[in-house]
Amino acid sequence: MQLTIPQKLIDLAHAAPFPLYLVGGAVRDALAGLTCSQDWDICAPCDAERFSKLAADNGFTVNGTYKNTGTVNLSDGKHKFEFTSFRTDVYRRGEHAPEKIVFTDDIETDARRRDFKCNAVYYDLRSEKIEDPLGGVSDIENRCISTTRAADEVFSEDGLRLMRLARLSAQLGFTPDLECIFGAKFNAALIAKISAERIFAELQLILHADEKYGRKYAHYEGLKLLEGTDILNYILPELAVGKGMPQRKDFHDHDVLEHSFRACKYSDSRIRLTALLHDTGKPAVYAETGKYHGHDVAGEKIVRQILERLKAPKKTIDTAARLTLLHMYDLDGKARESKIRTFIVKNYDVYPLLLLLKQADYSGCKDDLNVCPGILKWDRIFAQMQQENVPFTLRQLAVRGNSLNFVPANQRAQILKSLLLFCACDGSRNRTDTLLREAARLSEEHQSGGKA
């Protein structure tokens, strides 16, 4: 077992008059031969105030002591640690925070309050021995996940454990046992008791599960487990309803839900969330028209509703909704070059992300990892625009707002945007004299009742 422990923590363990243990991710990862987690969780049969004083006396910075939960946050200047007293927790059904905490000196009692056996293996920092009260080492060796008690009991206590199961399984490549699966499925509705912010944070971790230990497509495995345990029905019902909805066989090998999963599977990490949600408009428009046409427009609104419900950051919401609206443009490859040039300039700020989404969408149709043909066309046009020095932003225009003193102040912003589009099809137009003439024409047209 390769476990590199900060020396100050080892020194603290030798100074303590009680055994001090490392527990959780760091021990699990070391035993599994994975890159050691930097989550330094420590515990002992000792109350928080006593431990806090001991840590401070041994050169640690104590950032918070919470005697009601038996928790101490501390740092050695390089690493952060969280200490928790041995305890057992009593929950109100499904809620993340325990309703009652009872402290104990028994390591097995402490182990049984935890979620999974693989997270309930202790490393004695003084004796350098493993303490395994529940058989977690065997689970780690066999790369499986089982609960510390009856699965129904563990999941009924804390609804967030439902998503944590999917995340850990995906990140680690560990397989949940059947009791675990059935226990999660039976309690899936309890995810509704967890705050939207926590659900979104856990979803993001699942969508980036491949980044934790470098397991390719780990995020896809996590999503499939959310589906298999019915949790998807509660956190993303607009997505889950796509299960079983067929699509044209000449374009798709998968139903709407599986296509969304596969688009996410093959997507760049920057657009995972959008790739997952980009077709959520399909079930809605199909229910109204029996067709999928217009699902991009409906999807923009639905994606916005989903992410607002999950209290995602505003920028995340706006970007995902906008990319969803744009993802069908020129799908058939028939758009004229002039139209594509204008489209690129209008959407230049999200253009790289849109190409990533288009590629993910293409790959998710028939698991084809070749470059999407439409992207080859767009790349050629974009490269030509760059060669022509087409301006893509207002800062790249040869004129500024203060150059348009002959234009009413309330028109200048719109005129500048129109000038940008004016240059889209011909970069040579980006000259001061040419743009000033065009600005004068647009202003006159606007004042005479036309639109710039």
Locate each region found by the language model.
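Catalytic cores of the polymerase beta-like nucleotidyltransferase superfamily
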Residues: M1-A452
